[in-house]
Amino acid sequence: MEYYYCPRLLKFLQYLWDQLKQCFTRQPPEAKDTDTLVQEPDSQYGTWSEQRRSGDSFVPESPSSENDAISTRKQPPNSQPSSLSSQTEPTSLADRCDFSKDQRSTSLDRSSTDIDSTDGTELPPPGDAYPDGKTTDFSFIDQTTILDSSALKNRVQLSKKRRHRAPLSHSLRRSRGLEYENRFSLTEESGSTWMFKDSTEEKKPMQQEDSDEEEKTQRSGRLSSVQAQRLPIFPGMDHSVLKAQLRKRHESESPGEPSSAQPFKSPKPQLGTPGSRILPSSVEKEERSEEKSPQWLKELKSKERQSHYENQV
């Protein structure tokens, strides 16, 4: 690893270290009464003139400027001397800020010279802190080996092939099967006939071979159709004899159908649905009630019937 030397950073760190030393080496102030503190407001932080006399590197801002600004705000606007003082104050404040900046820069320069003297080596100017001549060498990248991703590519291809495909239609299967059969037949013929051909025989033209093949296919188709037509259903029996026997059976069964159908009829009356109940008629109800009822009820009922009939008439 190469380390770069940054003088500015070192100067800043040295400056902070000096400030910390000053903070810890200061003597604690003596205990004073509150009256003395009130009478001496600027003695705690120090006035501007005292700080200017003392050559400290760090110059804090004096609170006297703030007190002057507060006093100017409190004064009424009608007073002329206050207006004059307000005009002169901004310039004095700007001069003080410029002076404090100059003093800080001088203190930083002093601290940098102290560091240079302690190291014993002369540092280059700040412009040459990062030399452009040194460039990083990236030649080691070419020496590295590239990862072999062929196995991953093969896995991806296999996963694509294993995906579920839609089933082929019946017509496509037939057409493909015929193509494969034709290819195999051509290869078998070419492989089996070339060994037994006689070179002295005359070769037939292509048209004659095609016509011979067409005639063979037509003959085979005709033979298959004739054989399918001539195949009997019951071998060893004539069609005419079978037809005559079937006609006789139909004629004998046609007049005997009603007689044969009668014994199969059930004498029981057809009932409705198995879940339905048939209510008894009114006459049956009256007969049952007459059988169970006493004599005086029977007489009353007979009288009611007679009166009912008379009213209807």
UniProtKB/Swiss-Prot annotation:
Extent of Polar residues compositional bias: 62-77, 105-120
Listed Low complexity bias regions: 80-93
UniProt-annotated stretches for the region Disordered: 29-136, 188-313
Signal peptide start-end: none
One Pfam family cited in the UniProt record for this chain: Tankyrase_bdg_C
Bias (Basic and acidic residues): 95-104, 198-207, 283-313
Superkingdom per UniProt: Eukaryota
UniProt-listed InterPro entries: Tankyrase-bd_C, TNKS1BP1-like
Protein name: Uncharacterized protein KIAA1671 homolog
Organism name: Gallus gallus
